[in-house]
């Protein structure tokens, strides 16, 4: 190991300690935080923690951006993220004449009594999102799915999908119907033990 590698490792210690110290505080601010959740709050960007739910055993890495607006973000159990995921449950209204986009109020996001610019994001259990994935408002990613690195997910996908691209498209299903049944049976047996 050369001196540069040693210095790099030493420089990570303060960040790690700050994250370790503040993680319990941030977890208490969440709508729900399961057991064994790993987050790096001081090296990530979280907004709207009161609208964020994270299931047991999920790991949210440093460099994450999660913006929960008036719509919730729900992340299931045992979800894996590669570096720098982005999850945003809201959007800006851009169609108001004579008004800067930055000046649009929350009340102005409502059309006929419905906020169409903020919609929930749901990432179900056992999903793996690769590096630099972006998941936008109104999306549900079905359990057991895989999201390829760099994907921008703008619509929902069923369980056991493998998706990728900009915008994300279905690449293929992870398992056949028979394999899904066997996989879920095996997982159910593990849960009983």
Where are these regions (language model features)?
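Extended, small-residue-rich solenoid/repeat segments and analogous flexible loops
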Residues: 1-46
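General structural signal for secondary-structure boundaries
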Residues: 1-6, 17, 94-95, 100, ...
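Short acidic capping loops at alpha-helix termini that bridge into adjacent secondary structure
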Residues: 35, 56, 77, 125, ...
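Flexible, glycine/small-residue-enriched loop-and-beta-strand segment within the central core
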Residues: 42-54, 59-137, 166, 174-175
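Short, structured secondary-structure boundary patches
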Residues: 110, 176-178, 191-193
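C-terminal/domain-terminus segments
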Residues: 134-171, 175-185
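S-adenosyl-L-methionine-dependent methyltransferase catalytic module, highlighting the catalytic core
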Residues: 184-192
């Amino acid at each position: 190991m050369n001196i540069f590698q040693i210095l790099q490792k030493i420089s990570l210690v303060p960040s790690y300690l700050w994250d370790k110290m503040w993680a319990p505080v941030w977890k208490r601010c969440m709508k729900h935080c399961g057991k064994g959740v790993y987050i790096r709050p001081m090296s990530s960007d979280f907004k709207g923690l009161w609208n964020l739910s994270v299931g047991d055993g999920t790991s949210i890495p440093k460099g994450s951006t999660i913006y929960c607006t008036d719509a919730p973000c729900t992340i299931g159990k045992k979800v894996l993220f590669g570096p720098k995921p982005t999850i945003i449950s809201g959007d800006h209204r851009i169609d108001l004449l004579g008004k800067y986009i930055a000046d649009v109020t929350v009340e102005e996001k409502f059309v006929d009594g419905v906020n169409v610019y903020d919609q929930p994001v749901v990432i179900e259990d056992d999903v793996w999102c690769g590096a630099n994935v972006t998941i936008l408002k109104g999306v549900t990613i079905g359990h057991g799915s895989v999201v390829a690195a760099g994907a921008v997910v703008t619509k929902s996908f069923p369980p056991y999908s493998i998706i990728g691209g900009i915008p994300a498209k279905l690449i293929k299903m992870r398992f056949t119907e028979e394999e899904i049944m066997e996989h879920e049976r095996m997982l159910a047996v593990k849960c009983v033990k």
